[in-house]
Amino acid sequence: MIRNFKRTAAILGVVAAGSAALVACSESEEGSTDTATNGTPAAEVEGLSGTAGQLVGEGASSQQNAMDYFNVKYQEAVSGASLAYTASGSGSGRTNFVGGQVAFAGSDSPLSEDQVEPAAERCGGNDAWHLPFVIGPVAVAYNLEGVEELNLSIPTVAKIFKGEITSWNDEAIAAENEGVELPDTNISVVYRSDESGTSDNFQKFLQAAAPEDWETDGQQFPSAVGEGANGSNGVATQVTNIDGGITYVESGF
């Protein structure tokens, strides 16, 4: 999706749909129950009706809106309980979960191979589970004064984020937007500066859809082009304030 930011920039379409997972400890077989919780009132779920205090999690900023909603519903279901979530990024969330600082992590990417064993130790010898939790479409969003709609092919998107296309009236963009009056405004790339599952999913998509134009992968986005901002809200806010700005972000922002 290509989206024009006005505080919704402009989404050029969903380019990747990330399945954001919740990473948490499993129970031992001795501690497991056969109670089905789907649609069951909190008061009828064994051990839940007496729950109180704060459940603390950390991780993907793309999950912040969902976590805010879950907190409201959790408090409605369980009197005296609440959910606190710090949107520090997928990488930080997984690290602090493995370190025992939070009860769960929200992440757009699974635990790395070298985190699996420490996570099991942190969970008292039980496996850390990856539970599909939130579907977060990743969008390419731009802010370009006077231009409400744009079409950009995936190779063109890749070349923009690599710095090979640097002006909004570049012939490659013009060829894909016949009849659109494009200004000669410089393109300002904004990327996630923190370790991010959104960066990971976006780069995986570019590699798969435009392999000749994008080579890098991973949760750390290349910093050679543009400027970085922390978190989904950070990149969205930055592009909102820059005429000619472009970023990738979970579409809810």
Predicted regions: what they are:
Residues M1-L12:
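Bacterial N-terminal signal peptides that target proteins for export
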Residues P118-W129, N169-S188, G218-V225, N230-G231:
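Surface-exposed, Gly/Pro/Thr- and Asp/Glu-enriched linker/hinge segments
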Residues S26-E29:
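Bacterial signal peptide processing site
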Residues A84-S88, V190, E227:
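General small-molecule cofactor/ligand-binding pocket signal
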Residues G39-A174, Q238, V249-G252:
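N-terminal segment of the mature folded domain
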Residues G179-Q203:
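Non-catalytic, conformational "gating/processing" segments within enzyme and secreted inhibitor domains
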Residues E195-F253:
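Ligand-binding pocket segment of bilobal, Venus flytrap-like solute-binding proteins
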Residues S19-A24:
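C-terminal motif of bacterial Sec signal peptides marking the signal peptidase cleavage site
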